[in-house]
Amino acid sequence: MQIGCHVSISGSIDKSVDNAVERECSAFQIFTRNPRGWHAKTLTKDDITNFKSKLKESKIDRFATCAHMPYLPNLATPKEDGFEKSVKTLVDEVERCAQLGIPYLVTHLGSHLGTGEEAGIKKLVKGLTEAGKTKNDVMILLENTAGQKNSVGSDFKQLGEIFKQLKPAKKFGVCLDTCHAFVFGYDLRTEAKVKETFSEFDKYVGIDNLKILHLNDAKGDLGCNLDRHYHLGMGGIGEKGISAIVKFANKKKIPIILETPIDDDRDDFENIRKAKEFA
C-alpha cells in the first residue's frame, strides 16, 4: 500500500521528504518550485544530493513520488506567447524531475479559452509532444479535468483520444483525480459504481497507463463541475466510494496521493490515517 499527500518544499526541496515521513506517507507529491510564478530557481547540487539522500533513507519508493506542474502554464491556449512559455515550463519541469530522480510529472491539460475543443487539443498535443522529446526517463502524466468551461480531457473517451496521439508512448501516462472525475459525472459513490467507472477508464485510456491516483473527495455533487477537493468520506463521494477506490488502487498497486484541504475539520495527518483505514 502506497498512500501519501502533496507536501511542502518550504525551506528547501529536501524538506519535502521530512514532511512526507512526518505524515507517515509511503508516497508523496511536490512542486519542484514556487507554483505561482513563471520563474524557477535553479536546483543546486546540494538540493539534488540532499533530496535523493533523504528519499533513500526514508524507504519511500521512488516510483511512489511525483511532481506537479505549476499553476500558470496553459498547454491548450490559443495565445502563442503563452503557449511557448507553457511548453518551456513543461520541458524545464521534466528536466528538474530528472535531476531529482522523480519519475512522474503531473500536468493539467489547460483551457482552450473559447476556441473550441478541437483547437485546444491540437495545441495540447503539440506542446506535450515537444516535451516528450526530452532525453530522460521522466513520464508526463495527464490529469483528467473537472469539466469546467473551456477545459479538455474530462471525458475518459476524449482523454484516451488525446493520450493515444502522444509519441513516444513510453514518455506519457495518466493521473486520475477522483474529485474531478466525480464532479464531471462519473459516479464513485458505491463499490459497484467505482468498478463501472474504472472499467470505462480502462476501455478508453487503459488501467496500465494509470500511474498515480489523486484521491480527493468532492465539495460538490455528481456532475456539478465544481473543482473543490474535500476531506475523505465527508464530501459527495462519501465513505463507501472512497473505500472502494482505495481498495481498487491498492489491488492494482497504484500510488495514492491526497490533495485534501487543511482546515478546522481535518489536516493531512488525519486524512492520511483515514485513507489507511479505508484500505
Curated annotation (Swiss-Prot):
Source taxon at top rank: Archaea
Record key words, sorted: DNA damage, DNA repair, Endonuclease, Hydrolase, Metal-binding, Nuclease, Zinc
Sites where the protein binds Zn(2+) 1: 68, 108, 143
GO terms (BP aspect): base-excision repair
Coiled-coil region(s): none
CDD domains named in the record: AP2Ec
Record carries keyword Secreted: no
EC numbers: 3.1.21.2
Positions contributing to Zn(2+) 2 binding: 143, 177, 214, 259
Annotated GO MF terms: deoxyribonuclease IV (phage-T4-induced) activity; DNA binding; DNA-(apurinic or apyrimidinic site) endonuclease activity; phosphoric diester hydrolase activity; zinc ion binding
Names of required cofactors: Zn(2+)
The keyword DNA damage belongs to this UniProt entry's keyword annotation: yes
InterPro entries: AP_endonuc_2, AP_endonuc_F2_Zn_BS, Xyl_isomerase-like_sf, Xyl_isomerase-like_TIM-brl
PANTHER family, sorted: APURINIC-APYRIMIDINIC ENDONUCLEASE, ENDONUCLEASE IV ENDODEOXYRIBONUCLEASE IV
Protein name listed in UniProt: Probable endonuclease 4
Gene source species: Nitrosopumilus maritimus (strain SCM1)
Name of the coding gene: nfo
